[in-house]
């Protein structure tokens, strides 16, 4: 890259273990983003005060200290990366990286270096370990020579690790020359006072504010929510969670449409754990019209020094607004509210289903959020494409009132939002198209995909003219079957073939007959209730929806196969052998995905096979119709 360097699989070190992500250093600073979404760190070059390199097991570690006193550790660089990044940082940030060495001797005596909010234990000139002082919840003297540090133990730290550091102690002899004291204040006392200046001591005492009886949907229950200086606590009858503010990535304030409740979502990284279940989102539900008044338990000095322009002495207003403002002021997390999207009922979300759960899908400015269960956040930048799908293929009239939205991520993960009302299509399409997200079956790639959306929106009462929709309707054929083969994936190379008609259930004359035969068939359907066309009309009138299928003539010619069918026959065996545990429906789905990704040249052999079979079918159909006509005529004459 001309403007910087980009690295994958770089670990961010911290008390919660290491998390892999993408690291980028550019002329304006550096950034790290967790793999799969979540925590993001952006550092402006003007805030960088020191940079260090250290050789750690199997890799190199880049340490970055900023003006606020925070220290970040990025692990996973190769030896050849060190010189390139060193030159780039010197040139663009004006900071010369220092080289530190890691002590591996196992020696447990040495010196203590406190720089900003980091405590480093040094063995000679080498570093043994580091402790972030804001992670210290309590410190106390033990006798005259020992200093005990107790660290915050919360339900997010350690979610990815089996073990977590809880406490450690330092023995400072009276002969120590680094922390000079006297008889009343020995060296250990001097160290204790120094740590007190940076540690988060006292934050575990009385909460700043408490909200009683709050309904939390995930993890489910009613909790008392306590907001402390550095963490929040959820106290329920069966569960008790403690969450560091440093684990909060973002807050979401999302009103429910036509409902007296409002969601407040706390997104965490790392998540909290309950048994074997991880909860990356805490979904809180407030009564929208509830009004509260709260006074904060903060001294005026602390309010002015640390929380100036972030918190007030007291709050009065809607409970979800008060809660969000106080939590934002204490944690520093950003708040996301609904953006420009509006549903057909002027709401902020559309009703849909994810897996087996009904909920609301919120199209936001930078992502989609499905609530309340399972809470699913999808960022726009993680989406490879979206695809509109019809609700069902069984021909039932109710299916025309709903459609599905498939979201395919760049990591090959898929989310299918089902049962979205048909009248929400235009709003969703305009929003997604405005965000420049690729819409798979609205790009003119094939008539089959276009026909899916045409089926979804057929007979719509919306008078608004959508040029994209009109183009789709013009492209889509009128000959599509209502009961297609379950493995069939329509494509521009085979759409419009005779196999699109449901020949198993209709008269064979409709398979390849001309327009005259089709019109005569429609006229005959009014007087012959056994015809399928009459069956469709009775569905539209709300009467009997289904009638017994007409028995197929065993002498009728076999229908022509589509290119995809030939492809499926050729590849199904390979798919089964390589994935023996894959269900039949998943095999069909995988084959469909493979077919869609194939180029025109790759599809050509199967297209040629289908063309040959199509000619065979047309010839056999002509012969079959001729023989059937002779039999009918001769039968009438004999009567």
UniProtKB/Swiss-Prot annotation:
Key words of the record: Chromosome, DNA damage, DNA repair, DNA replication, DNA-binding, Nucleus, Phosphoprotein, Transcription, Transcription regulation
Protein name per UniProt: FACT complex subunit SSRP1
Family: Belongs to the SSRP1 family.
Alphabetized PANTHER family for the sequence: FACT COMPLEX SUBUNIT SSRP1
Major localisation: nucleus
Record-level Gene Ontology MF annotations: DNA binding; histone binding; nucleosome binding
Phosphoserine PTM sites in chain numbering: 634, 638
